Amino acid sequence: MFNMNINSPVRFVKETNRAKSPTRQSPGAAGYDLYSAYDYTIPPGERQLIKTDISMSMPKFCYGRIAPRSGLSLKGIDIGGGVIDEDYRGNIGVILINNGKCTFNVNTGDRIAQLIYQRIYYPELEEVQSLDSTDRGAQGFGSTGLR
């Protein structure tokens, strides 16, 4: 069903000379680091759209998932949103959320997030009157416990 050549390159454009190419930091890294093209200041409890000045063409049957970097997560920096659709061709922006207690500064060229390519499935949706039952049912949000 998925006829995708995993060795095909993903095409990207540097929109300005401030943009840096996405990079993997090790051969086994799942994500490609994304870099800020500008300086930003994010006060505690605030969020900021960080521009990369990179646009790219996602592989067929894939989307890009923008994920946090573990080092930034330790500082209370998280990601908002985080999906790059297969047909999006604009400047890739990353929403950084400062959950920390101190102002967070982003400098031009800082690694701000990682881009992970994931396969996507486009099912047909069918509205029905009821769903088959399961042992769990509609129990959610902590219903399975911690252990």
From Swiss-Prot:
Chain ranges passing through the membrane: none
Any one biological process term the GO annotation gives: dUMP biosynthetic process
Binding-site list for Mg(2+): R24
Stated induction or repression of this protein's expression: Expressed in the early phase of the viral replicative cycle.
Reactions listed under catalytic activity: dUTP + H2O = dUMP + diphosphate + H(+)
Entry keyword annotation includes Hydrolase: yes
Enzyme nomenclature, EC number: 3.6.1.23
GO molecular function per UniProt: dUTP diphosphatase activity; magnesium ion binding
Keyword Metal-binding: yes
Binding annotation for dUTP: P68, R69, S70, G82, V83, I84, D85, Y88, G93, I95, R111
Pfam families tied to this protein: dUTPase
The protein's required cofactors: Mg(2+)
Record keywords: Early protein, Hydrolase, Magnesium, Metal-binding, Nucleotide metabolism
Enzyme class: hydrolase
NCBIfam families: dut (TIGR00576), PRK00601.1 (NF001862)
Family: Belongs to the dUTPase family.
Protein task: This enzyme is involved in nucleotide metabolism: it produces dUMP, the immediate precursor of thymidine nucleotides and it decreases the intracellular concentration of dUTP so that uracil cannot be incorporated into DNA.
Protein name: Deoxyuridine 5'-triphosphate nucleotidohydrolase
Native organism taxonomy: Viruses, Varidnaviria, Bamfordvirae, Nucleocytoviricota, Pokkesviricetes
